[in-house]
């Protein structure tokens, strides 16, 4: 009976170890959803005044017009808002996933046939980012937040 118990325990431990190896945990969470809007000021006011999401950080064009703003939904979740352009109609633009090891995620996704651009550091947010596209055409940003990134600062400064 004892041997049977040890056998069952060993099988369970082995199965758990296999599951952990098969399901990488380096994709941490959904970090943001990016939306384009024809009326940036109205949309920004909606996210702050109606939804109650504080603006975490923002960037402007040289002429002073908005480039993009991040509104913080929770400690780790944001809405990225940007104006429409000829290349970017109103609506959903992309979503961003926080990862702990960007290089490993990029390598794994490429090995599985996904087209992923080489990682780079965003000059604005200071986050490492790689952009991918799903087979359905959805743009996905894979983001790794170092201590100097604006995302990391906003997440660290969040008050519950």
Language model feature labels by segment:
Residues 3-15:
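Bacterial N-terminal signal peptides
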Residues 25-28, 34-78, 134:
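Core segments of cupin and vicinal oxygen chelate
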Residues 48-50, 108-112:
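Short amphipathic alpha-helices in soluble, non-transmembrane regions
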Residues 77-79, 88-89, 150-151:
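Short loop/beta submotifs within extracellular cysteine-rich repeat domains
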Residues 80-82, 141:
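Conserved beta-strand in the GNAT
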